[in-house]
From Swiss-Prot:
Family: Belongs to the ubiquitin conjugation factor E4 family.
Start-end of Low complexity biased regions: 446-459
Keyword Nucleus: yes
Catalyzed reactions per annotation: S-ubiquitinyl-[E2 ubiquitin-conjugating enzyme]-L-cysteine + [acceptor protein]-L-lysine = [E2 ubiquitin-conjugating enzyme]-L-cysteine + N(6)-ubiquitinyl-[acceptor protein]-L-lysine
Protein name: Probable ubiquitin conjugation factor E4
Biased composition (Polar residues): 1029-1038
PANTHER family: UBIQUITIN CONJUGATION FACTOR E4 B, UBIQUITINATION FACTOR E4
Pathway noted in the entry: Protein modification; protein ubiquitination
GO biological process: ERAD pathway; protein ubiquitination; ubiquitin-dependent protein catabolic process
Gene: PUB1
Domain writeup: The U-box domain is required for the ubiquitin protein ligase activity.
Keywords linked to the UniProt accession: Cytoplasm, Nucleus, Transferase, Ubl conjugation pathway
One Pfam family it belongs to: U-box
Domain called U-box: residue spans: 940-1014
Length: 1038
C-alpha cells in the first residue's frame, strides 16, 4: 500500500514560493544553481529570535535587503536580480491560480503581489542610489561623466523592448533580448511619487539623447524616439523632462548650435537627410549611401531612395509632433515647451543671414524638421475656411515677450516708426490690459483657444498679456519656416546655381585641355569633378527630404494661405483700392512673412503636382493688391517676387491648366487691376535703391513682359490695357513706354557690340597657328571671356526681343502715347537705330554661323521694327511722325527705307506692309527737306530762344521752379520720364510744377512768324548729312 504525501502547511508553501521568487535560502542547500544565495547571517539572526527558518511576508523586505547588501560571488547584480524577482513573482502568481483552496490561493496572491511591489520599489531605490547596495555596474560622477559614459540606464533596454524596438547593441545596452516582466514598467513609473522617479527619468532622457547624437535618418533612431514618446506620455515623465537642466540649456556661451547639441530634444531634431558641417556630420552618410554617382544610377534606384528617405523623415516628424503635443496638452508643461521653442528660434536668428556660421547656428536639418513639426501643430487651425484666424493677435508681433520680432525688417515701417508706434500703442492700451486679459481667460475654456501664460516669471505688466496658443503657434511657425524650410529652399536654389556654374566651368576647363593640355588643368578638372559630385549629393538630399515630400509642401502652403488672408484682414479684406493710409499693424509686420509665402509659391510652382488641390485664389488676390503698392510693401524686390509667382502660374499654352487660366481670366480683381499694376511695377522697378538696380530691373521686367504678352491675348485684359493707355496717356503709361524704349535700345546695343567681340575671339581661335603661340594664361582668359560673352549676348538678345515684340503688338492698337511730343522723337530714334543696324553697311559684321544660339533672329526683328513704323504711321493723324524720323541726326538716312524694303521682299513680308513702309520713308524724306527749308528761313536763332539742353528752338518754353532756367516743355518732359529731378540742380521736379514762360513764347512765335514770311534763299544743299551708302548684295538677312 502506497504511503500518502504529507500535507504542507500554508507557512511552508509561502516559504517555498518566496525562495523561488528571491533565489535565497535560509538553510544550506545542495542546489547547484549559483544564483541561489544562502543567507547564513540572516538565518542565524532569525534563529536567535526564536523563529522558524521559513521565509514569510513579514521577513520579505529584510531578506531582500540582506540579499542586495551582501557580497555574494556569482550573484546577479542588483537590477537584473530585482527584475528577475518581479518576473518570478509574476510566474508564481500564475501557478497559484490552480490552487483549489480559495483561502490559501488568496493568501498566496497577497504574497506574490507584495513581492512584485517590493521588487519595483527596490529597483527605484537602486537606480536612484546606485552605490547603496554595491555591486553596481553603473559609473558615478557629474553630468559630464554621465554624458560620456558608454553604459545606459538598465531600464532603457526594457523600455525599448516595451515599445517594440529591434537590436539594442548600438545604444551601448545589453542585447540579451531581456524584456520587462508583464506590468513591471507600469508599476515602476506610475505607482510612485515624482521625487523618487525624477533622477531616474532625467538620466533616461540623457541616455536617449546620447543614443541619437550624430545619427542620420538612415540610422536606427526609431527605438529612442518611441522610448521618448513613451516616457513623455507618463505625467511624471513629462514633468521630469521639462524640468531637466538640459531642457533649455543655459550658459554664457549658449548659442543655436550648442542648444542643438546639449538640449534633450536637440539631437532628435538633428536627425536628417540634409548634410551638416563636417564637425557635426551624421552617420550613415545619406548622400554617399543613396546618391553617390547619381548620374549613373537607374531612375528606379533614385526613386526608391527618395521614397525611403521621405518615409523615414515622416516617422521622425510624427514622433516629434506627438512628443510636443503631449507636452502642450498639459497645463503643467505647456509653458516650458513654448519657452523651449522660443529659445531655439531666438538663438538661431542669424540663420536668416545669407552666410550662416555652422558653429554658432543649429543645422539646417534641425530647422527643417522643426518646420515640419510646427506645421503639424498648426493643422487644427488650418481648416479650409480658416475659421480660427481671429485668434491671431497682431500685437503679439510687437508686444509678445517670447519672440524678438520688432527688430526684423518690416513690410513698410522703418525701425524708428515701429519703435515709436509700439510705444504709443502700449501707452494707449495700458488701461485696457486688465479687461483684455479677462477676455483671454474666458477663451482658455475653449480647446481651440488653449492659452499659454505669457511669461514664466511674470515680472512686468507687459508680460501679463496672455495670447492664445493659436496665436503663439502661428508666429512661432512663421519664424521657424523662415529659418528652416525657406532657408533650406534658398540653399537648394543656390546649390543648383553653383552646380550649373561649376558644370560650365568644367566644360571650359575641358575645352582648354583639348587645346593645350597641362598637369595643372588635369588637377583642376579632377578637383572640380569631386566638388560637383559632393554638391550633387547634397542637392539630391535636399530634394529627397523636402521637394519630394508633397504633404510637407502642401502643409506649408496651407499655412501661408492663412498668413496672406490674415494679413489682408489687417487692411480691411480683399477689396481695392487699398485704404489711402497703411494701417500700422500691417506696416510693422515682418517683411519675411510675405517674402516666405512668395518664395514657397515659386518653388511649389516648379514641383510637379505640388499645387494640385491648393486654393490659389487668395494668393492671387493678395499679389494683385500689393505688387504695385509701395505704400504698403516698401521693398521693390519683394513686389517683383510677386510677379515671379504670377509668371510661374501663367498658362504657357492652350492646353495649360484651366485652374491657372481661371486665376488670370476669371477673377474680378485680376480683370480690373492686373494689367494696371503690372505696368505700374514696370515703372517703379527702375529705381530700387540697390547698387545693382540697373541690372536687376531687366530680370524683373522680363517676368512682367511675359505676363503682359500673355494678357494681351486675353480680350478682357486687352480692353483694360486700352483704357489704361487712354486714362494714363501722360501718366504711368507714358512712363512705361519710355522705359520700354530705353531698355530696348540698351539691350540691342549691348548685344550687337558683344557679337562683334565674340566674332573677334572666334577669328583669333580659328587661326590655330597664331593661337597656339599665345601664352597659356592668355588663351584661358580669352576662352573664359568667350563663354561669358556668349551667355550675356544670349540673355540680352532674348530680353531685347521681348521688348520689341511688346512694342510691336501694343502699337497695333495703341498709338497715341507713342506720338506725344515728348515721346515721338525718342521712339523714332530707336526705330531708326534698329533699322540702321539691320540693313546698314555694318550689317555684314553681325553675321553669325549660328545666330539662333544667341537668340538673334534678324529677319523676325526687322519685320517687327517695320511693323512698329507702319503701326505708328497709321495712327499719326497730325503727321508728326515723319518729321520725328527725319530729325534723327544719328541714324536716319532716306536710303535705309529703300534698303529695308528690299530685304522685306526677300524674306516674304506682306506687300501692304512694305508699301506703307515705303510711303512713310517718302514722307520722312519730304519732312527732312521741309525742316531744312524752315531752318534756313529762320537763319541765326537768338540764344535766348534755344533750349539749353538740346540747343534747338523752343516751341513751348517753361520755367523750372527751382533753378529758374527756361527749357522746352517736350524736352524736359522727356527727361522727367526717366528722372524726376531738375537737371541743373537736382531738385525734385514733376511735370505739374513746370511754369509756362508766356512772354518768351510770344517772342519766339513772333520771331518764327516774321522769318517764315521772308523768302528763303536758294542754292543750299537739301541736306548736310553724310550719305550712308547701301547695297542690295551680301545682306545680313538673305
Amino acid at each position: 500500500m502506497a504511503t500518502s504525501k504529507p500535507q504542507r502547511s500554508p507557512a511552508e508553501i509561502e516559504d517555498i514560493i518566496l525562495r523561488k521568487i528571491f533565489y535565497v535560502t535560509l538553510t544550506e542547500s545542495t542546489d547547484s544553481d549559483p544564483r541561489i544565495v544562502y543567507l547564513e547571517m540572516t538565518a542565524a539572526e532569525i534563529l536567535s529570535e526564536g523563529k522558524e527558518l521559513l521565509l514569510s511576508r513579514d521577513l520579505m523586505e529584510r531578506v531582500l535587503i540582506d540579499r542586495l547588501s551582501g557580497d555574494f560571488s556569482d550573484a546577479e547584480p542588483p537590477f537584473p536580480y530585482l527584475i528577475g524577482c518581479h518576473r518570478r513573482a509574476y510566474d508564481e502568481s500564475k501557478k497559484i491560480q490552480s490552487m483549489k483552496d480559495k483561502n490559501l490561493r488568496s493568501e498566496m496572491e497577497i504574497v506574490t503581489k507584495q513581492a512584485k511591489k517590493l521588487a519595483v520599489s527596490y529597483c527605484r531605490i537602486h537606480l536612484g542610489n546606485p552605490d547603496m547596495f554595491g555591486n553596481s555596474d553603473k559609473p558615478s560622477g557629474g553630468l559630464d561623466n554621465r554624458l560620456k559614459k558608454r553604459n545606459v540606464s538598465p531600464v532603457l533596454p526594457l523600455i525599448f523592448a516595451e515599445v517594440g524596438s529591434g537590436s539594442l547593441d548600438m545604444f551601448g545596452a545589453s542585447s540579451s533580448g531581456v524584456q520587462a516582466p508583464p506590468g513591471f514598467l507600469d508599476e515602476f513609473f506610475k505607482d510612485s511619487d515624482f521625487d523618487s522617479l525624477d533622477s531616474i527619468l532625467k538620466e533616461l532622457y540623457e541616455d536617449l539623447r546620447s543614443t541619437v547624437i550624430n545619427v542620420s535618418v538612415l540610422g536606427d533612431f526609431q527605438p529612442p524616439l518611441r522610448a521618448l514618446k513613451y516616457l513623455v506620455s507618463l505625467p511624471v515623465g513629462a514633468k521630469s523632462l521639462v524640468s531637466h537642466e538640459w531642457w533649455v540649456p543655459r550658459g554664457a556661451y549658449m548659442n543655436g548650435r550648442a542648444m542643438e547639441l546639449t538640449s534633450i530634444l536637440g539631437p532628435f531634431f538633428h536627425i536628417s537627410a540634409l548634410p551638416d558641417n563636417t564637425l557635426f556630420k551624421s552617420q550613415p552618410d545619406v548622400g554617399q549611401q543613396c546618391f553617390s554617382e547619381a548620374s549613373e544610377r537607374r531612375p528606379a534606384d533614385l526613386l526608391s531612395s527618395f521614397s525611403t528617405i521621405k518615409n523615414f523623415m515622416n516617422i521622425l516628424y510624427s514622433g516629434l509632433h506627438d512628443v510636443l503635443m503631449i507636452l502642450l496638452k498639459s497645463t503643467d508643461t505647456r509653458e516650458r515647451v513654448l519657452q523651449f521653442l522660443a529659445e531655439v528660434i531666438n538663438a538661431n536668428a542669424s540663420r536668416a543671414h545669407i552666410q550662416v556660421d555652422p558653429v554658432s547656428c543649429a543645422s539646417s536639418g534641425m530647422f527643417v524638421n522643426l518646420s515640419a513639426v510646427m506645421l503639424r501643430l498648426c493643422e487644427p487651425f488650418l481648416d479650409p475656411h480658416l475659421t480660427k484666424r481671429d485668434k491671431i493677435d497682431p500685437k503679439y508681433a510687437f508686444c509678445g515677450h517670447r519672440l524678438k520680432l520688432s527688430d526684423l525688417t518690416a513690410l513698410h515701417a522703418s525701425s524708428e516708426e515701429v519703435t515709436e508706434w509700439i510705444g504709443k500703442d502700449a501707452m494707449a492700451n495700458a488701461n485696457d490690459a486688465g479687461r483684455e486679459n479677462g477676455n483671454e481667460s474666458r477663451l482658455l475654456q475653449s480647446k481651440e483657444a488653449t492659452s499659454s501664460s505669457s511669461n514664466a516669471s511674470g515680472q512686468n505688466a507687459k508680460s501679463a498679456t496672455k495670447y492664445t496658443f493659436i496665436c503663439e503657434c502661428f508666429f512661432m511657425t512663421a519664424r521657424v519656416l523662415n529659418l528652416g524650410l525657406l532657408k533650406a529652399l534658398s540653399d537648394f536654389k543656390h546649390l543648383a546655381q553653383d552646380i550649373s556654374r561649376g558644370e560650365d566651368n568644367l566644360a571650359t576647363l575641358k575645352a582648354m585641355r583639348d587645346q593645350a593640355p597641362s598637369p595643372q588643368l588635369e588637377l583642376d578638372i579632377s578637383r572640380m569633378e569631386k566638388e560637383l559630385e559632393l554638391s550633387s549629393q547634397e542637392k539630391l538630399c535636399h530634394e529627397a527630404q523636402i521637394l519630394r515630400d508633397g504633404d510637407f509642401i502642401q502643409r506649408a502652403l496651407s499655412f501661408y494661405r492663412l498668413m496672406v488672408v490674415w494679413l489682408v484682414g489687417l487692411v480691411g479684406g480683399f477689396k481695392m483700392p487699398l485704404p489711402s493710409t497703411c494701417p500700422m499693424e500691417f506696416s510693422c509686420m515682418p517683411e519675411h512673412f510675405v517674402e516666405d509665402a512668395m518664395e514657397l509659391l515659386i518653388f511649389a510652382s516648379r514641383i510637379p503636382k505640388a499645387l494640385d488641390g491648393v486654393p490659389l485664389d487668395d494668393f492671387m488676390n493678395f499679389i494683385i493688391m500689393f505688387m504695385a503698392s509701395p505704400e504698403y510693401v516698401r521693398n521693390p524686390y519683394l513686389r517683383a517676387k510677386m510677379v515671379e509667382v504670377l509668371n510661374c502660374w501663367m498658362p504657357r499654352s492652350s492646353s495649360s491648366s484651366s485652374a491657372t487660366s481661371t486665376l488670370f481670366e476669371g477673377h474680378q480683381l485680376s480683370l480690373e487691376y492686373l494689367v494696371r499694376n503690372l505696368l505700374k511695377l514696370y515703372v517703379d522697378i527702375e529705381f530700387t535703391g540697390s547698387h545693382t538696380q540697373f541690372y536687376d530691373k531687366f530680370n524683373i521686367r522680363h517676368n512682367i513682359a511675359e505676363l503682359l504678352e500673355y494678357l494681351w491675348q486675353v480680350p478682357s485684359h486687352r480692353n483694360a490695357w486700352r483704357r489704361i493707355a487712354k486714362d494714363e496717356e501722360k501718366g504711368v503709361y507714358l512712363n512705361f513706354l519710355n522705359f520700354l524704349v530705353n531698355d530696348s535700345i540698351y539691350l540691342l546695343d549691348e548685344s550687337l557690340n558683344k557679337i562683334l567681340e565674340i566674332k573677334q575671339i572666334e577669328a583669333d581661335m580659328s587661326n590655330t597657328a597664331e593661337w597656339e603661340q599665345r601664352p597659356t594664361q592668355e588663351r584661358q582668359e580669352r576662352t573664359r571671356l568667350f563663354h561669358s560673352q556668349e551667355n550675356i549676348v544670349r540673355i540680352d538678345m532674348k530680353l531685347a526681343n521681348e521688348d520689341v515684340t511688346m512694342l510691336a503688338f501694343t502699337s497695333e492698337e495703341i498709338t497715341a502715347p507713342f506720338l506725344l511730343p515728348e515721346m515721338v522723337e525718342r521712339v523714332a530714334n530707336m526705330l531708326n537705330y534698329f533699322l540702321l543696324q539691320l540693313v546698314g553697311p555694318q550689317r555684314k559684321s553681325l553675321s553669325l554661323k549660328d545666330p539662333e544660339k544667341y537668340e538673334f533672329r534678324p529677319k523676325q526683328l526687322l519685320k517687327q521694327i517695320v511693323r512698329i513704323y507702319v503701326n505708328l504711321a497709321r495712327g499719326d493723324t497730325v503727321n508728326i511722325f515723319p518729321g520725328a524720323i527725319s530729325s534723327d541726326g544719328r541714324s536716319y538716312n532716306e536710303q535705309l527705307f529703300n534698303a529695308g524694303a528690299d530685304v522685306l521682299r526677300r524674306i516674304g513680308e506682306e506687300g501692304r506692309i512694305i508699301q506703307e513702309f515705303m510711303e512713310l520713308g517718302t514722307k520722312a524724306k519730304a519732312a527732312a527737306s521741309e525742316a531744312l527749308d524752315a531752318e534756313a528761313a529762320l537763319g541765326e536763332i537768338p540764344d535766348e530762344f534755344l533750349d539749353p539742353i538740346q540747343y534747338t528752338l523752343m516751341r513751348d518754353p517753361v520755367i523750372l521752379p527751382s533753378s529758374r532756367i527756361t527749357v522746352d516743355r517736350p524736352i524736359i518732359q522727356r527727361h522727367l520720364l526717366s528722372d524726376n529731378h531738375d537737371p541743373f540742380n537736382r531738385a525734385h521736379l514733376t511735370s505739374d510744377m513746370l511754369i509756362p514762360d508766356i512772354e518768351l513764347k510770344a517772342k519766339i512765335d513772333e520771331f518764327v512768324k516774321s522769318h517764315q514770311s521772308k523768302k528763303r534763299t536758294s542754292g543750299e544743299d537739301s541736306s548736310n548729312k553724310e550719305r550712308i551708302q547701301t547695297t542690295n548684295s551680301d545682306m545680313l538677312i538673305d
